[in-house]
Amino acid sequence: MSDSAFSKDNRWLLPEGVDELLPPRAAQMETLRRQLLDQFGAWGYELVMPPFIEYLDSLLTGTGHDLDVQTFKLTDQLTGRLMGVRADITPQVARIDAHRLRREAPSRLCYIGSVLHARPEGISRSRNPVQVGAELFGHAGVESDIEIISLAVASLRTAGVAQPHLDLGHVGIFRGLARAAGCTPAQEGALLEALQRKAVAEIDELLDEAAIDPHLRRMLRALPQLNGGLEALDHAGEVLAEAPQGVRQALRTLWGVAAGLERRLPDLPLHFDLAELRGYGYHTGIVFAALVPGYGSEVARGGRYDDIGRVFGNPRPATGFSADLRTLVQVADGQPAVPAGKGVLAPWGDEPDLIKVIEALRAEGERVVQELPGQQGGAAAQGCDRRLQQDDGGGWVTRPL
């Protein structure tokens, strides 16, 4: 937008991709925030509140290039050091677990807060999402992956997403094959990009240029086709039967998570994609995304990221998920938290009996709005469907409008 666009008449414009919430959507989101934190607590997850801004070297430690380019940077006027406005809360929570809590036992931590992105992550995506999530530190088994995915699905259902679809992968399969093939970092990166686009011709060309062992080439070439339901894992077992041990272990891990989810969530649609490598520079194992039919991108995502605690001096296995609260409210099947037109319009006054009645109604959970002297608009404009009036005996009663 040109400088001339910012005239006195439109100085109220928000930056592109930056959103604000109005009634009743803001109330709906706040209600969901409370519900999700209560749910996390019921599962044993403790709330942490990292700062909105940190020194850049701490904020980006162990996170990779993607988060770096999404982070707004500025100079601390007190120290002259570079600072960053967080674009993702997960690394901050990992720092808290590794550096501040330093527990031996597993830690279950949850969070919710605003983040800021330098660029939107997709078409019509906000640059100031409200990130909510949960992380489980200190356990490397499939059980913790199953718990995190189950909690993610439960959270989506709490938000009103009745039937999410789950897309599962494991970054260790491609990583193990690429490393066994002796790919350089540049070759691995080029293959990664082509796999994510399922650009088969480009994959063939890259494999030809790399002069890879024929057996490993065949396995890498097959990854874009290894997607679907549980039958995709059966097919992967055949294709990767002679793969390196680490690759076969990654596939067994994927099978273990799938079996656990089928027992816990038998009605949850599962889809597997071995070329699904989101967060490749960050994740180390299982990766997943929750999708909703009719919505163009994931509504929640997560996975395992065992290496991040190492840079804080306390290497711990870790797995977790996150979602944007704004997105959850947008795609939810539920109704607004505060239905329009529900409330009591009370007269203005400071008589003790009137104040006592108003306080009692509010204590019972009623929404009570006092009518200001000389105000424009009646009960409907205030979102009220009843009025507080005095009866013939001087007592206060609510009457429908």
UniProtKB/Swiss-Prot annotation:
One Gene Ontology cellular component? cytoplasm
Task: Please give the pathway this protein is involved in.
Answer: Amino-acid biosynthesis; L-histidine biosynthesis; L-histidine from 5-phospho-alpha-D-ribose 1-diphosphate: step 1/9
Query: Where does the record place it?
Result: Cytoplasm
Q: Has keyword Metal-binding?
A: no
State one molecular function term (GO): histidine-tRNA ligase activity
A UniProt-annotated Pfam family: tRNA-synt_His
The UniProt keyword set, sorted, is: Amino-acid biosynthesis, Cytoplasm, Histidine biosynthesis
Q: List the disulfide bonds.
A: none
- What role is this protein assigned? Required for the first step of histidine biosynthesis. May allow the feedback regulation of ATP phosphoribosyltransferase activity by histidine.
Q: Which NCBIfam families match?
A: hisZ_biosyn_reg (TIGR00443), PRK12292.1-1 (NF008935), PRK12421.1 (NF009086)
Q: What name does UniProt use for this protein?
A: ATP phosphoribosyltransferase regulatory subunit
What lineage does UniProt assign to this protein's organism? Bacteria, Pseudomonadati, Pseudomonadota, Gammaproteobacteria, Chromatiales
